Amino acid sequence: MSVFILFYLWIVPIVIGILCSVAAHKSKGKMRVAPGIAMIVLSIISLITAFTAGHTNFHVFIGGMFLFGTFLVGSAFPFFFGLKKKEK
């Protein structure tokens, strides 16, 4: 169970957050906010999955809620890089 928690609930959202942050930092114009929005959409998908699949197994519900929180907190970094002005 600890490997599941470490990999699925922490490592995967951190890697996705880093990739979205790099994409937000390198993009231009209004598309700079799109990676942050994508992370929020992923958190909403994990929340919906937690509520629908969590009826049969409580561990799936708890894992989905942790994943929702991790994605939601991690979406702040792409928004930060997307809304920050580029320095020349």
Swiss-Prot record:
Subcellular location, record wording: Cell membrane
Domain of life: Bacteria
Membrane topology designation: Multi-pass membrane protein
Regions that span the bilayer: 3-23, 33-53, 61-81
Keywords: Cell membrane, Membrane, Transmembrane, Transmembrane helix
Any GO CC annotation of this UniProt entry: plasma membrane
Name of the protein this chain belongs to: Uncharacterized membrane protein YdzK
Native species: Bacillus subtilis (strain 168)
